[in-house]
Amino acid sequence: MSFQDLEAGRGRSLASSRNINGGGSRQDTTQDVASGIFQINTSVSTFHRLVNTLGTPKDTPELREKLHKTRLYIGQLVKDTSAKLKEASETDHQRGVNQKKKIVDAKLAKDFQAVLKEFQKAQRLAAERETVYAPLVHKPSLPSSYTSSEIDVNGDKHPEQRALLVESKRQELVLLDNEIAFNEAVIEEREQGIQEIQQQIGEVHEIFKDLAVLVHDQGNMIDDIGTHIDNSYAATAQGKSHLVRHQRHKDQILL
């Protein structure tokens, strides 16, 4: 079963696979890896769309929060799938493991490597855009009845108007303080988000390096399988040739 099979709709979640099968068999581990890759690929597509929205009129704090949650979700999927793939690889080195399973696991490792590359690209683009652009926020404003421009400020007017002007000024100062505090919070949140992206980029990079070693190791194992098959085929062909020559020699003796 390959990653392409799962894209046709036969993927299952990691959790459901564990609950149904118990995760105890070799096949379950391979299924978990395939399911994880499918989920990562789907989530990375969503992540790409969200990243492309950064810097547009749709770039809001709500979108940044959704982007943050999606990024964390993918990161956890990557860790879980990487662990399962290592488990499958260790199993493949045991004696008596089906050669077909080894080949399937090797293909899944390459699929995992490809989808990780896409996620890394999206991560770097997200870090770049979140650094450059700030989300659009709706700033609070005073009701029109409180704007000082509409109030007669002459001292000989009614005390009610003077009281209204004082209240208007107070409201403006409160809003100004709130806006400053809000902007500081937005800046702090952006900086924290960028730091989290950089940290996750580092984590995924380490997983990618480990995966490259695993893919190389599995490639050697697949080459060994191919060599073994070729040698077996050559030995079989040679054996048949010997039998034919022996039969011909026997026939000549009988004649």
Curated annotation (Swiss-Prot):
It is found in: Membrane. GO terms for biological process: intracellular protein transport; vesicle-mediated transport. PROSITE patterns: SYNTAXIN, T_SNARE. Residues 184-246 form the t-SNARE coiled-coil homology domain. Keywords: Acetylation, Coiled coil, Membrane, Protein transport, Transmembrane, Transport. It is a single-pass type IV membrane protein. Residues 1-31 are annotated as: Disordered. Expressed at higher levels in leaves, flowers and stems than in roots. In cv. RLD, the 22 amino acids extension regenerates a typical syntaxin transmembrane domain. In cv. Columbia it encodes a protein that has no terminal transmembrane domain, but that is however not detected in cytosolic fractions. May function in the docking or fusion of transport vesicles with the prevacuolar membrane. Belongs to the syntaxin family. This is Syntaxin-23. It comes from Arabidopsis thaliana.
